[in-house]
Amino acid sequence: MQQASTPTIGMIVPPAAGLVPADGARLYPDLPFIASGLGLGSVTPEGYDAVIESVVDHARRLQKQGAAVVSLMGTSLSFYRGAAFNAALTVAMREATGLPCTTMSTAVLNGLRALGVRRVALATAYIDDVNERLAAFLAEESLVPTGCRSLGITGVEAMARVDTATLVDLCVRAFEAAPDSDGILLSCGGLLTLDAIPEVERRLGVPVVSSSPAGFWDAVRLAGGGAKARPGYGRLFDES
């Protein structure tokens, strides 16, 4: 049964199909989500440039469809031009809709801070250029990237085909390269990470913040109503 106290949560998603990311039904099966798709062509700066100017229009569309809060559910889309751009984009969405708005980059920052992670090992789906922009963004936000291991993927649909074993191995390699890290950021909203997160946390004993789960966590908190995720998906949901 839908929880009446929680308003509809609007999500701007990279794929053109405009579907609510699969994590939503697993984490918050009773909450109302709607989505609008940007049609991102590639997970590269050139791909982001082609769609970033339409984000505010998608936010307006979601507001007209009944959203009470809006999140841009793309991590690299919101960090690739830096911290000031992420903040300005959030303001532009809010001013255009009159709604509380957020981004996935803001979500991962909030998640890392909620878990006390300052020194962060990066495990990403990205190519090197995007990894460098992520590290610079985190540094602007007073976090310390300790190293990075990545998959080098540029295809939007390819992200969802990365299996759990590959994600666990990626996180383990990222942490083993920087074992003094406080935790791990598993970055890219297209990765399906819910099964990997608890396994990595069990193996390594450090928290994992992952883009899509953090995006849902952040948007639900912004919406209010006190909804809790189903248990078993990691420290971000269990401890914050």
Curated annotation (Swiss-Prot):
<keyword id="KW-0456">Lyase</keyword>
<dbReference type="Pfam" id="PF17645">
    <property type="entry name" value="Amdase"/>
</dbReference>
<dbReference type="InterPro" id="IPR026286">
    <property type="entry name" value="MaiA/AMDase"/>
</dbReference>
<protein>
    <recommendedName>
        <fullName>Arylmalonate decarboxylase</fullName>
        <ecNumber>4.1.1.76</ecNumber>
    </recommendedName>
</protein>
<dbReference type="InterPro" id="IPR053714">
    <property type="entry name" value="Iso_Racemase_Enz_sf"/>
</dbReference>
<keyword id="KW-0210">Decarboxylase</keyword>
<dbReference type="GO" id="GO:0047436">
    <property type="term" value="F:arylmalonate decarboxylase activity"/>
</dbReference>
<dbReference type="InterPro" id="IPR011060">
    <property type="entry name" value="RibuloseP-bd_barrel"/>
</dbReference>
